[in-house]
A protein has these predicted regions:
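Helix-turn-helix DNA-binding segment
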Residues: 452-510, 517-528
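Intrinsically disordered or compositionally simple regulatory linkers and C-terminal tails
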Residues: 303, 307, 311-321, 419, ...
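Hydrophobic, well-ordered secondary-structure elements that form the walls
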Residues: 282, 337, 372, 377, ...
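Flexible inter-repeat linkers and adjacent short helices
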Residues: 1-98, 102-111, 117, 291-294, ...
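Tandem amphipathic alpha-helical repeat scaffolds
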Residues: 4-9, 36-50, 73-90, 112-129, ...
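Amphipathic alpha-helical segments of tetratricopeptide repeats
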Residues: 7-8, 20-28, 59-69, 99-109, ...
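Alpha-helical solenoid repeat scaffolds used for protein-protein interaction
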Residues: 237, 246, 257-271, 275-418
Length: 528
């Protein structure tokens, strides 16, 4: 009786681990006498992405209930069956199950209605119908507020924020995430429900090129997700940390973060998601190989590409159901396009990019359009079409300006840096956005790039036992924009090993151990 009374409130506060331990401590016969506890266990397992075990709990509930399931238990079963169907990749079938369950719900069943709206939003998001997904997530937030399920309100707001990011509405997404944080922290600063909001803010700060802030937020998302044993928080923290560390040039750290995500998805029995993680790993290895001259990393990326069959079979895979949801397919195929470009197969790369751009335009995913147009610009440049390359880059800049995108351009590498000045000056961007982009690239949109590199900024005042040299300040500023050692060396016309030596001196003078700490310490000291 005590567990039955407290399990659901615990679950609504995102404490899945405690609920699972409670229910697994009971004899199976006791759960059979209270079939609703089988359902509560299933929901707790879903929260941890332990979907195979969740299905076992659903089957146990169905056996215990027989034909005597009332409206509430029947509604729970229908939603869980839809969720497991969705996880198996049968999106259309899952939507039909959810809609039938919604029709059968009694009046006032806000808890179940909130669950259904949340799952309908997820299904439409996977189907790449962003307007429908946004509508259902908004309804989920309202119904879950009425039901008192704060955690599911936060999940709904997380999805709404992610949709805004996809649509290029980064400022609105940040406002919504901060609102979610305030709501979550009403339940205590260490509320697991805050994990996803921290992850959203980490993603946005990364895009706005505040990498130290992004590292801190992504780490917080992971810690809170781990504290509550909430898989969404762990995944958001892992994926975002991987992207931030990739931008910082910490490739081993980025790969380790992806390893954590893969462990979660393997436990969930989700091989299609794992395949996406493998693609993201290949993208990191590609960056590592180009940035550090690491032949082994390049070979690893090439092995993934060959083994996946996507270099030649991308068209069939893009149209089929091999990957879970259009957006996740796109993450994979952006890596494929980059590998095709690296191999010099620009024709195939441009054909793939044209299909990806059409998908992104159809659903209004501005962020994706920006990423595709940047790669299109690189492909056209490789073909010698300078005018076409600049036109594609200007298109990306125009789409990116309202959200203030910066990092997506920086991460495209030095080839984009060579075109950015011309593209900025010809794109009609606002002076503020043009200035922020120019500063991020270490150039001035109003002057030749060579002159911008040659003109150091005024040296800041330093209150350090041993002040940084002018060259060390230059290195620190470039590293703070997220450039790798190799890219910073190219800007300063010095070897990557020399950049590394300067960084070692900087760490010693600032009393730090890595670039993230050094950037944070330098900001606090007014050096940046």
């Amino acid at each position: 009786e005590l567990i039955s009374e407290h399990a659901l409130p615990r679950l609504m506060r995102a404490d899945a681990g405690t609920v699972i331990r409670w229910l697994r401590s009971l004899p199976a016969a006791w759960l059979d006498r209270r079939p609703e506890l089988h359902l509560t266990l299933a929901w707790a397992l879903v929260a941890r992405f332990e979907l195979q075990l969740a299905e076992e709990a659903v089957c146990a509930a169905e056996r215990a209930l027989g034909a005597g399931a009332g409206p509430e238990a029947g509604g729970n079963l229908a939603i869980l069956r839809g969720l497991l169907t969705l996880a198996a990749g049968r999106t259309g079938e899952a939507i039909e199950l959810y809609e039938r369950a919604l029709e059968r719900l009694p009046e006032g069943a806000d808890f179940l209605r909130g669950l259904l709206f949340l799952e309908l939003g997820t299904a439409h998001l996977i189907a790449d119908d962003l307007p429908a997904a946004e509508r259902f997530f908004a309804q989920s937030r309202t119904a879950n507020e009425r039901a008192g399920s704060t955690f599911r309100v936060l999940v709904s707001e997380w999805h709404l924020a992610e949709i805004r990011i996809a649509q290029g509405r980064l400022h609105e997404a940040a406002d919504l995430a901060r609102q979610s944080l305030r709501r979550a922290e009403e339940g205590g600063r260490n509320s697991p429900g805050a994990a996803m909001a921290h992850g959203v803010l980490a993603e946005i700060e990364r895009e706005w090129n505040d990498l130290p802030a992004a590292v801190e937020l992504a780490g917080r998302a992971w810690q809170l997700g781990k504290h509550g044993e909430i898989a969404n928080g762990l995944l958001v923290g892992s994926f975002t940390m991987a992207r931030v560390l990739q931008s910082l040039g910490d490739f081993p750290g980025a790969l380790a973060a992806l390893d954590r995500a893969e462990e979660i998805m393997n436990r969930a029995g989700q091989p299609r998601f794992v395949e996406v993680i493998h693609a993201l790993r290949a993208g990191i290895q590609l960056d590592q190989g180009h940035s550090e001259g690491d032949a082994e990393a390049l070979e690893a990326a090439a092995r993934w590409a060959q083994g996946s069959g996507l270099l030649d079979g991308w068209r069939e895979a893009l149209a089929g159901g091999r990957f879970p949801g259009v957006h996740r397919r796109e993450l994979t195929f952006l890596v494929v396009a980059r590998i095709l470009l690296a191999r010099g197969d620009t024709g195939a790369a441009r054909a793939l990019l044209a299909d990806l751009l059409a998908l992104a335009e159809r659903s209004g995913r501005v962020h994706s359009q920006v990423e595709v147009l940047i790669l299109e610009s690189l492909a056209r440049k490789a073909q010698g079409d300078t005018a076409g390359a600049l036109a594609a880059l200007r298109g990306a800049l125009t789409l990116a300006e309202p959200g203030g995108f910066v990092r997506t351009f920086l991460d495209a590498g030095p080839e984009i840096a060579g075109m950015i000045r011309q593209a900025i000056s010809a794109s009609g961007l606002s002076p503020d956005y043009a200035r922020r982009l120019a500063e991020a690239f270490g150039t001035d949109a109003a002057m030749p790039e060579e002159a911008a590199v040659a003109m150091p900024a005024a040296a800041p005042s330093q209150d350090l036992p041993e002040p940084l040299t002018e060259r060390e300040v230059e290195v620190l500023r470039l590293i703070a924009t997220g450039l790798s050692n190799a890219d910073a060396g190219r800007r300063l016309f010095i070897a990557p090993s020399t950049v590394k030596k300067h960084l070692e001196n900087i760490y010693a003078k600032l009393g730090t151990r890595n670039r993230t700490q050094a950037i944070a310490r330098a900001r606090a000291a007014g050096l940046l």
